[in-house]
Regions:
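Alpha-helical solenoid repeat scaffolds of the TPR/TPR-like class and their adjacent stem/linker regions
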Residues: 1-524, 529-598
Length: 598
């Protein structure tokens, strides 16, 4: 459509100069009108086409900018400046490969074009070609060492590559050139966070917020760091401040849900995560967190479906099994079929969900159960008709397959229908005999202890206890404490060496057959949320599970029993991090048990 003619004849060069001055001063609507006036009488006038294209791009209309920039290129096809701006339009349209090719042309004409090298690096980063991006940005800095955007982009790529010390130095270089660079302060904080320097990270976020009190990302990042510092109420305040600025920010809503869950406000947390997922349906963390909350609240019908989002999580990337045979989620009968059940997460998960294997065998399926090698011998006791193999062994032919942790979904499990017939595992008699000979002669109630799990588990700080915290239990007379702890941290080993009231056999264990035999010899097992708690429950042994304030979903909320393990008794932190309160409850319960036995 033709542009409207101006009301009176215009001096084209003079009008273009006026428009350029307005554009330079940031008065884009007035400049845009003058360029349009020029193009209404001179549709091919280069300066008007080029500058109006730039304004359209700055105004968020890259489609209009593209049409105008193509017109400008027809007039000056070899102009590095026009080609560079054309690459910006292509970048804005998401046409990254075309933008990259255009920048290569620019640099073949003008080799020391700093912005072209820098933008080429930024586009390579978007394409996931991070090392090449660094090379391009470094070429920009070789031309101009204090180029702020290039320094910032370099820091951002280094951070993305996990090279946090180098990223921190680059952010510091940005701030040496431009102390009020808000994004550099914010992202410097994220690099510090990754380096474990959380108080320094908070200072960086606070500097960013002092410069821009409405910077949502800085509030969000500050909240995340405060949450890791267990400053929950302050973290919540950060997220809520961010949401007053952007009420529908999905990431902030999800993080608000996380902190509400840790504060024990599970219903509020669920509503918040569902809101985040509604705003951004492909937001994996929001969908996943909503599922965990539904499961923790006992809403299995919805939660088990949401639990399938685990496969899309970044930390699970590449772990989902894909076979030519169909995935079975309960849709077809299994009678006469061979089904492979494959492990996917930790030892405790395998022990817990292997309980479904006998149910499939009862339905007429031939069951192949793949487990971690240290569990193979123990899981072989799970029942007839089930072939147990270790990970890495040859897999017999099969018709269907299912990951172990999808079995509750396949069986449409509800709280009332959890298969909880125990014991469903058994310790080997010869191992029981062996470990019986390793224990002191029984003189009292024999209690097995496990106080810490895998040190590299992401939730280890929340679920493991230092042995020193359990020392008040040792003061209860009439109890023989046995350590079933296989991996013992140095500080805990020293306590055991110095305290004769606890006998250490756990460090001698080989596989789970040894652990199971030792558990079978106990009157009671006291354990944190680790594989031994699941093992004791599966063996039908009384087990007291010590739980953090916000535990894993399978322990549910607000109850002292557990439908997965009928012999379990749960001791929950009365407040965040309050292991002293848990130990006090357990001490009283031990005294009560002894008095009943007496």
């Amino acid at each position: 459509m033709a542009l409207p003619q101006p009301l009176k004849p215009i001096n084209v060069p003079q009008t273009v100069q006026q428009a350029f001055e307005l554009q330079r001063r940031g008065k884009l609507p007035q400049a845009e009108k003058l360029y349009a006036d020029v193009l209404s009488v001179r549709p091919d006038y280069f300066e008007a086409l080029h500058m109006l294209a730039v304004i359209k791009l700055q105004s968020g209309d890259p489609v209009a900018a593209l049409r105008l920039m193509i017109g400008a290129l027809k007039a000056r096809p070899k102009s590095p400046e026009v080609l560079f701006n054309y690459s910006l339009v292509l970048d804005a349209l998401g046409q990254y490969d075309e933008a990259l090719a255009t920048l290569d042309v620019v640099l073949s004409i003008k080799r020391r074009f700093v912005e072209a090298h820098n933008n080429r690096g930024a586009i390579l980063e978007k394409l996931g070609r991070d090392e090449e991006a660094l090379e391009s940005i470094d070429r920009a800095l070789a031309v101009k060492s204090n180029h702020t955007d290039a320094l910032y982009n370099r820091a951002s790529v280094l951070r993305k590559l996990g090279r946090y010390e180098e990223a921190l130095k680059s952010f510091d270089r940005v701030l040496a050139v431009k102390p009020d660079h808000v994004k550099a302060h914010n992202n410097r904080g994220t690099a510090l966070e990754q380096l474990g320097r959380r108080e320094d990270a908070l200072a960086s976020y606070e500097r960013a917020l002092a410069l821009d009190p409405n910077f949502v990302e800085a509030y969000n990042n500050r909240g995340n760091t405060l949450l890791k510092l267990a400053r929950h109420e302050e973290a919540l305040a950060c997220y809520e401040r961010a949401l007053t600025i952007e009420p529908f920010h999905a990431e902030v809503l999800n993080n608000r849900g996380n902190v509400l869950a840790e504060l024990g406000r599970h219903r509020d947390a669920l509503a918040t995560c569902l809101q985040a997922a509604a705003i951004k349906p492909n937001y994996v963390n929001a969908q996943w967190n909503a599922g965990l909350l539904q499961l923790r609240l006992g809403e299995f019908a919805a939660g088990l479906k949401q639990y399938e989002w685990r496969w899309k999580r970044e930390e699970r990337a590449g772990t989902q099994r894909h076979y030519p045979q169909p995935l079975w989620l309960g849709e077809v009968p299994v009678a006469g079929k061979t089904i492979l059940l494959h492990r996917e997460q930790g030892f405790g998960d395998t022990i817990q969900f292997a309980r479904y294997a006998p149910l499939l065998a009862k339905q007429g399926a031939r069951v192949i159960l793949e487990v971690q090698p240290p569990l193979k011998s123990l899981l072989a006791t799970i029942g007839a008709g089930i072939e147990v193999i270790g990970s890495g062994e040859d897999v017999p032919s099969f018709d269907l397959h299912c990951p172990l942790m999808s079995l509750p979904l396949a069986f449409h499990t509800e709280l009332a229908t959890i298969p909880a017939e125990i014991p469903y595992l058994a310790a080997a008699p010869e191992r029981i005999e062996h470990w019986s000979g390793q224990l002191p002669q029984r003189r009292a109630l024999r209690v097995g202890l496990v106080w810490s799990g895998n040190a590299v588990h992401k939730d280890d700080h929340n679920r493991s206890i230092a042995l020193a915290r359990l020392k008040p239990l040792f003061d209860v007379d009439g109890i023989e404490f046995i350590s079933l702890q296989k991996d013992v941290r140095d500080a805990d080993a020293q306590i055991m060496a110095d305290d004769p009231r606890i006998t250490d056999i756990g460090r001698q264990f080989g596989d789970f057959d040894d652990t199971a035999a030792a558990v079978a010899l106990m009157d009671l097992v006291i354990a944190v949320d680790t594989s031994v708690a699941h093992l004791a429950g599966a063996l039908g042994k009384p087990v007291w599970v010590l739980l953090p304030f916000c535990p894993d979903w399978r322990w549910l909320t607000d109850r002292a029993d557990n439908p997965w393990y009928p012999t379990a008794r749960l001791f929950r932190q009365p407040g965040i991090g309050d292991w002293e309160g848990v130990v006090g409850q357990v001490r009283q319960a031990l005294a009560a048990r002894l008095s009943q036995n007496g």
